[in-house]
Each structure stands twice: as C-alpha cells, then as structure tokens.
Amino acid sequence: MGPEKPRAVIAAARANGVGVMGIRAVQAGALTSAIDRPLPDDHPEMRDYRRAEGFRRLAAELQTNPASLAHRYALRLDIDTLVLGVKNRQELVDCVAAAAAGPLPAELVMQIDRSVNRDGD
C-alpha cells in the first residue's frame, strides 16, 4: 500500500466531518535508527524495518534522526492528533522538537514517499 490510500481515507473522513487520529508514526520502530527489541528476522516488524532502509538513508542525508523525520511527516498529514507512543523522556523531547520544527515541505514528503520499499524485502 502506497501513501495514496491513507491520504484517501483521511480525505474521506474530512469530507464527512470525522476527525482523524494518526498512530504508529514510527511504524513500531521501522522508521527509527534501530529496532530496540529482539525480533526474529522473519517478524513483520523486521520486514518493515528492511523496507524502510531508503527512509533511513534519506534521514542520514538530511542529517536528522529518522524518528523525528517520521513524526514531522505524520504531522504534515491532515490529522487532528498524533499518538506518539514514546517510551521515555528523551523520546518525548525528540517528538516535541520535531513538532516545533514545523511541517515538512511538500517536495520532501514526496521524496520520503519514494524512499520506502513497499514491494517487500
């Protein structure tokens, strides 16, 4: 599934006066620097992590933390709230800083969309 489907769902919700809540901005760790728990190589979250390698490369090119980039990407969508799912104070500080940095430019959003391998491993 590419970025078009979630955006279509958000647009449909908006058209019907329904609020939208974003969840899993870092995709259970796939859009972070590293998975922080042991998982078997064939676990779905590990497959997602491998698919996001291009996203992490892009974050490195931009000299930013992948999780911060993921949060800024999520905040660029037309949503009412974003569930952060932080595990510690530093992650909360990082999320607040990402929000303070403001929305991503549309060109960067398109670059991120192209960076993620949605076809599999």
Feature locations, PLM:
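Beta/alpha (TIM)-barrel catalytic core signal, keyed to glycine-rich beta->alpha loops juxtaposed to Asp/Glu
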Residues: 1-121
